[in-house]
């Protein structure tokens, strides 16, 4: 029986990991912060020895060094691969003019989405520090995407760059809107800011989905992922599917392809 793969998704806000067996089933998973101040280190002591680590890192060199230190402490000399977007991989063709410019997290997510929803046209919306959209045709062609500030970043920008508007977190904003979602307009400043930025997210998604369906002359499945997906979903008027495991699933496919090639 082959050893499992350790999968690591180092995003802008936190680091998620999973252990995938030979059937690409995630048998263990967790999350931790970029620094020790962000919470405890992952406890990998009970995990079986993986054959290697497959890493998507969009968080920079400091996080890469932290990951190396954690891996070396648990499994010295463990082989590790930091993935990069390619022109084509695992059934997905990259439509970027410079394929390597596409973030590794978005690339892994596209591969995961292609496997999760085969033979379907997809719009994948991920709500993190940034809100990203990817258009993926049923034949596996990624035709392009959009990047916008995330919900939290929108609200933080308004609070930081204006004199009288508050700086709100998504937790606070979500609570403010919990009793006000039926109202299209709000009657105080914190709720107006929370709802305005949330509707900006929803409006972007709905416009992109309608434009994509019109351009392709076919139905498009809207797939939502990320920390703010629940809040944005409640503001949407379009049908949608929630799937938060696309990046790790994509990493599992990339790891399996690499192991088969080796």
Swiss-Prot record:
Membership in a protein family: Belongs to the type III pantothenate kinase family.
Localization in the cell: Cytoplasm
Keyword Cytoplasm tagged: yes
EC identifiers of the protein: 2.7.1.33
Domain of life: Bacteria
Cofactor: NH4(+); K(+)
Pathway annotation: Cofactor biosynthesis; coenzyme A biosynthesis; CoA from (R)-pantothenate: step 1/5
Alphabetical UniProt keywords: ATP-binding, Coenzyme A biosynthesis, Cytoplasm, Kinase, Nucleotide-binding, Potassium, Transferase
Binding of ATP, residues: 9-16, 129
Role according to the record: Catalyzes the phosphorylation of pantothenate (Pan), the first step in CoA biosynthesis.
Quaternary structure note: Homodimer.
Species per Swiss-Prot/TrEMBL record: Burkholderia vietnamiensis (strain G4 / LMG 22486)
The reaction(s) this protein catalyses: (R)-pantothenate + ATP = (R)-4'-phosphopantothenate + ADP + H(+)
This protein's name: Type III pantothenate kinase
Cofactor note (record): A monovalent cation. Ammonium or potassium.
